[in-house]
């Protein structure tokens, strides 16, 4: 059979190249069709002028519970001091046991999530086995590092990786949360929770206080939704539950059975319960604050 693209190298002609390179979809595409990659990852020059007028997405939270992990994200995107979107999806299932949530420049974040999912699927198709969790971390770190030039010009997108390590010796502690910096450095969270985005400080403070209540997936989901509610209370770029429009955070639960999207009806139920409990609190005491 003749290779149909004379202006590009065939797979078999990549002499001297380790075969493992072919298991990376990003590396393969960079060789065969670099124009199909995002400019930052393909090595092209990022747009001048930074990202002052580009939509941004925040906030993402993740927390572990015995036997799994929960990841949730708000729905708001901002453009400077304006709200550019109210129903943005920021949490994606990337394979059977992994999910990513990415905060930052919306366009870059979405490209990251989609390309990472294809990267994992491509590896499994070629090698016949899925990547180990450590391998998944390294692949995402390489992608983040490839975006460094764009990040230095303001097109920053930071992922949060959550997953279930099927090779863990103890299934009850197999939930994993990994955070990344702009240079591709990564850290496996040992505290049991993490957040990224402009509201991450407030979300982490909320989870720190509530984490002792987490005993299973359902209680973990409630704490994640409540953390986003607290973040939205103090961070204008984070959107809380919108009862009027019927817009609620999105969430993924990952355990030994795999990763599943939490139904919107369940998140709405939890959000309403949280708002009702906060609204019902007697802030000023039994006399309403009057003498």
From Swiss-Prot:
UniProt pathway annotation: Protein degradation; proteasomal Pup-dependent pathway
GO terms for cellular component: cytoplasm; extracellular region; plasma membrane; proteasome core complex, beta-subunit complex
Enzyme class: hydrolase
Main location as per UniProt: cytoplasm
Applied value in biotechnology: In the course of search for new antibiotics, a class of oxathiazol-2-one compounds has been identified that selectively inhibits the M.tuberculosis proteasome over the human proteasome and that kills non-replicating M.tuberculosis.
Xref: Pfam families: Proteasome
EC code(s) of this entry: 3.4.25.1
Knocked-out gene: effects: Cells lacking the core proteasome prcBA subunits exhibit reduced growth and persistence in mice. They are also attenuated in interferon-gamma-deficient mice. They also display increased sensitivity to reactive nitrogen intermediates (RNI) and increased resistance to oxidative stress.
Post-translational changes noted in the entry: The unprocessed form of PrcB is phosphorylated by PknA. Processing of PrcB is greatly retarded in the presence of H(2)O(2).
HAMAP family: Proteasome_B_B
Name by which UniProt lists this protein: Proteasome subunit beta
Regulation acting on activity, per entry: The formation of the proteasomal ATPase ARC-20S proteasome complex, likely via the docking of the C-termini of ARC into the intersubunit pockets in the alpha-rings, may trigger opening of the gate for substrate entry. Interconversion between the open-gate and close-gate conformations leads to a dynamic regulation of the 20S proteasome proteolysis activity. In vitro, chymotryptic and tryptic activities of the proteasome are both completely inhibited by epoxomicin and by the peptidyl boronate inhibitor MLN-273. Also inhibited by Mg(2+), Ca(2+) and SDS.
UniProt xrefs under InterPro entries: Ntn_hydrolases_N, Proteasome_sua/b, Proteasome_suB-type, PSB_actinobac
Cellular location(s): Cytoplasm
Role, per record: Component of the proteasome core, a large protease complex with broad specificity involved in protein degradation. The M.tuberculosis proteasome is able to cleave oligopeptides not only after hydrophobic but also after basic, acidic and small neutral residues. In complex with the ATPase Mpa, degrades protein targets conjugated to a prokaryotic ubiquitin-like protein (Pup). Among the identified substrates of the M.tuberculosis proteasome are the pupylated FabD, PanB and Mpa proteins.
UniProt site (Covalent link with the inhibitor MLN-273): 58
Free-text note regarding domains: In contrast to Rhodococus, the M.tuberculosis proteasome does not require the propeptide of PrcB for correct folding and assembly.
Residues excised as propeptide: 1-57
Catalytic activity: Cleavage of peptide bonds with very broad specificity
Listed result of changing residue 58 to A: Loss of proteasome proteolytic activity. This mutant enables optimal growth in vitro and in vivo, confers RNI resistance but is not sufficient for persistence in mice
């Amino acid at each position: 059979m003749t290779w149909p693209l004379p202006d590009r190298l065939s797979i078999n002609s990549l002499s001297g190249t380790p075969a493992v390179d072919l298991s990376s979809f990003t590396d393969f595409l960079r060789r065969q069709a670099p124009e199909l990659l995002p400019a930052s990852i393909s090595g092209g020059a990022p747009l001048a002028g930074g990202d002052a007028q580009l939509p941004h997405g925040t906030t993402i939270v993740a927390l572990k519970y015995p036997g799994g992990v929960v990841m949730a994200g708000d729905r708001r995107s901002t453009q400077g001091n304006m709200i550019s979107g109210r129903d943005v999806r920021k949490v994606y299932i990337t394979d059977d046991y992994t999910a990513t949530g990415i905060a930052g420049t919306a366009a870059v974040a979405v490209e990251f999530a989609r390309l990472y999912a294809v990267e994992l699927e491509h590896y499994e198709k070629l090698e016949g086995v899925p990547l180990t969790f450590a391998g998944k971390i390294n692949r995402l770190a390489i992608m983040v590092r490839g975006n460094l030039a764009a990040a230095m010009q303001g097109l920053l997108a930071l992922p949060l990786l959550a997953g279930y390590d099927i090779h863990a010796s103890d299934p009850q502690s197999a939930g994993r949360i990994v955070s990344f910096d702009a240079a591709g450095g990564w850290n496996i969270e040992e505290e049991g929770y993490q957040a990224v985005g402009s509201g991450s400080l407030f979300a982490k403070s909320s989870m720190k206080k509530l984490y002792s209540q987490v005993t299973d997936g359902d209680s973990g989901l409630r704490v994640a939704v409540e953390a986003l509610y607290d973040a939205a209370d103090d961070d204008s770029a984070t959107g809380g539950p919108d009862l009027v429009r019927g817009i609620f955070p999105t969430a993924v639960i990952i355990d030994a059975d795999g990763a599943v999207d939490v139904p919107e009806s369940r998140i709405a139920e939890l959000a309403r319960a949280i708002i009702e409990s906060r609204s019902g609190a007697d802030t000023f005491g039994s006399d309403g604050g009057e003498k």
